[in-house]
A protein has these predicted regions:
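Short, solvent-exposed polar/charged micro-motifs at secondary-structure junctions
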Residues: 202-204, 271-274, 325-328, 387-390
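Catalytic core of nucleotide-activated saccharide and alditol-phosphate transferases
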Residues: 258-272
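Short, charged low-complexity linear segments at domain edges
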Residues: 1-12, 41-62, 174-177, 329-330
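A short, structure-level motif marking secondary-structure boundaries and short turns
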Residues: 2-3, 12-13, 62-63, 163-166, ...
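General beta-strand structural signal in soluble alpha/beta enzymes
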Residues: 192-194, 233, 260-263, 315-317
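Iron-sulfur-cluster electron-transfer modules
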Residues: 18, 48-241, 245-246, 268-271, ...
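Local cysteine-cluster metal-coordination motifs and their immediate loop/turn environment
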Residues: 18-36, 68-84, 165-170, 196-208, ...
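Iron-sulfur (Fe-S) cluster-binding modules
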Residues: 1-29, 33, 99-108, 156-159, ...
Length: 444
């Protein structure tokens, strides 16, 4: 099968990194998941050497395969590399190579389509039962009278930024609405893009289908290049997919970077002095922050933001910070459960009022635990919003705590009817995209 231009450039980038890699093993030495992933006592030099062997068409070693499959995208390896290459990207390409050899393209493509539909159905159903038409329009999912074309810029003008939601935050849309409220308060103009129509391509990349992944990502990238100052991202998975795979590959193809992409929390940093006076209402709360190190600076920005809120006391639970985001640990389910359990117990022992998360994935996985533990589960932006006098309903949490698919569908029957959504489809989504997404079982 003929390679696309994107695939050729992607392969060239991989080859360049392979050539630059000295097999020193420092990336393996700093990785926090070598133990849980089953790397064992293999020498770090041999582990990275096995990864390179796989990328060059070899079989690698059991330890190198385990490391690649268990990668949680923590990112420690990137800073540790003395050659300034990206081991996290090389591990992604290793998983692509393994998938290609193990499964025929037709089956991989079918799997990619199935996974994409699962996300698309989840986004459609779960956003539709929580949002009004105006709110859907505000999030770029429906053109409405309030927000023509999803942009807050004046007619005929380009917005300051494109705010790229990704797909899955639309399942917990109150988080994205708070982000828009904050940008409105700062006087920043933006156009909201996201959802399945602006897919980042990571779903297809995970199946080893670089052709479809590249095509989807490139199409989305070209549409994202509307902001005067770049793109603000919310989803960490989309951010890594674009900044480590798509944008550098497009740059290699076209000779120029189309735009810079900045995570929302890092976008806020230079605006904190303007945001501080808007935080007028005290929020008396002892808060522990669930942390992920995968995108450098995001956790620190979250802590800095919480410290600005009057009345908030930050409690350090002294727990490990691992992975890009919660679902990046899905290949290591027992390890993930142990991390979640230890954090819940530490939060309860510390007497916190709330366990706060930054990312939507963690919110979805954690929120129903509020039923059984003596603290709330909130997103950081909910706390900021409360101090600004803002409030959005947390419909996802309310529904998930019911823990009954039929009761949830019955609760949403009017919204489902208004949006012409089949209750049978809604029930399937509730099971797969809500109730089954519970790494640590409820209860204590």
């Amino acid at each position: 099968m003929t390679e696309t231009a994107f695939e050729t450039a992607l392969a060239a980038r991989t080859s360049d990194m392979i050539d630059a890699c000295t097999r020193c093993g420092k990336c393996v030495e700093v990785c926090p998941v070598t133990g849980p992933a089953g790397v064992g006592d293999a020498a770090p030099q041999d582990v990275i050497g096995g990864v390179i062997d796989i990328l060059q068409g070899g079989e690698g070693t059991a330890a190198s395969l385990a490391w690649a499959k268990g990668c949680a995208l923590s990112g420690d390896c990137i800073e540790a590399c003395p050659e300034a290459i990206n081991p996290r990207f090389l591990l992604a390409m290793t998983r692509v190579a393994v998938a290609r050899r193990a499964v025929e393209l037709r089956e991989r493509r079918k799997t990619g389509i199935e996974h994409f539909r699962l996300v698309a159905d989840g986004v459609k159903v779960l956003s539709s039962v929580q949002l009004t038409d105006d709110e859907l329009a505000r999030l770029g999912q429906k053109v409405g009278a309030r927000l023509a074309n999803g942009s807050t810029a004046k007619e005929g003008e380009r917005p300051d930024f494109v705010f790229y939601t990704g797909c899955n935050v639309l399942k917990t849309p109150h988080i994205a609405l708070y982000a828009l409220d904050i940008m409105d308060a700062l006087g920043v103009t933006y156009k909201v893009m996201g959802g399945p129509n602006h897919c980042c391509g990571v779903i297809q990349l995970r199946t080893g289908d670089t052709e479809v992944s590249g095509r989807q990502a490139t199409s989305s990238l070209d549409r994202l290049a509307e902001g005067k100052t770049g793109v603000i991202s919310w989803c960490p998975s989309c951010h890594v997919q674009f900044t480590e795979t798509t944008i550098p590959t497009i740059e290699k193809m076209r000779g120029a970077r189309p735009f810079e992409m900045t995570p929302f929390m890092l976008f806020l940093k230079p605006h904190l002095d303007r945001l501080r006076p808007l935080l007028t209402r005290p929020v008396a709360m002892r808060v522990a922050l669930h942390r992920h190190p995968g995108i450098k600076g995001v956790t620190e920005a979250g802590i800095e933001l919480l410290r600005m809120v009057p009345g908030v006391e930050i409690v350090d639970l002294d727990q490990p910070a691992v992975g890009l985001v919660g679902n990046a640990l899905n290949a290591l389910p027992e390890y993930k459960r142990s991390l979640h359990r230890a954090e819940r117990e530490a939060a309860a022992a510390a007497g916190v009022d709330a366990l706060a998360v930054i990312y939507h994935v963690d919110y979805r996985e954690f929120c129903a635990h509020e039923r059984d533990w003596p603290f709330r589960v909130v997103n950081v932006l909910e706390i900021v919003g409360a101090s600004m006098g803002l409030d959005h309903a947390t419909g996802f949490k309310r529904l998930k705590i019911m823990q009954d698919a039929d009761a949830i569908v019955a609760d949403c029957k009017d919204m489902l009817a208004a949006r012409n959504i089949d209750p049978a489809l809604a029930r399937e989504v509730v099971l797969k995209a809500m109730l089954n997404e519970q790494p640590l079982p409820l209860g204590r």
